[in-house]
């Protein structure tokens, strides 16, 4: 943690130091629960992605505002036992936090695109050519393996969420570029990482100026939990106390 201004800043490496956890094996629920316990109110995801569009070359950043979730082997909700909740994911990112990200990126004159759709694939393999062309036909912008179910779980925990995706390669659809390989990704990723560090520093310095007190994420559980109170056992309420205690303990 690093103390800045009104609160602390925490960094969480999804894949662990040295990148030894595959996307499918990331414990997204534990990560979000731990951040909520620490008092985190906002998450900015920074991740490597492949590009699905000609005008999003390697090195460019995308401030994502929509997702297509193609994952199938991950725990996607905190509310999977006795207590059921249906949070809205129509707008999965927080506009104020996106504005803060954009200002931090612009300050360093990093090439970027505001708004974009991120296809989240299960992995760990890269796409087939047929899959890549399918996602392009959906008008998606980038493809990666990490933002889902992270964004959904952050919403369930009432944590505002933004995603900054760093393009490392053209996915295999591009006829004039080699098929994706790890060495190619790492080479571009190292350059992107330096830009991301500066962006994050700028973000830490100014993000609180952009937070919307009326962001629907702040109290989304008020209208999401559908299970009748008499069906909620104390054991399950206690299990959910970190992410949902605000509403379950009323």
Listing of model-derived features with the role each one plays in the protein:
Residues 11-24, 116, 134-137:
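Short, basic, glycine/proline-bearing loop/turn elements
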Residues 22-44:
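Glycine-rich anion/phosphate-binding loops
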Residues 36-39, 136, 155:
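Non-catalytic positions within long, well-ordered alpha-helices that form the structural scaffold/packing
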Residues 51-130:
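Mid-sequence, gly/pro-rich, charge-dense loop/helix-turn segments that line enzyme active sites
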Residues 145-182:
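Zn-dependent metallopeptidase/amidohydrolase metal-coordination segment
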Residues 172-219:
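His/Asp/Glu-rich mid-to-C-terminal helical/loop segments that flank catalytic regions of hydrolases
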Residues 221-250:
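Acidic, Ser/Thr-rich low-complexity intrinsically disordered segments
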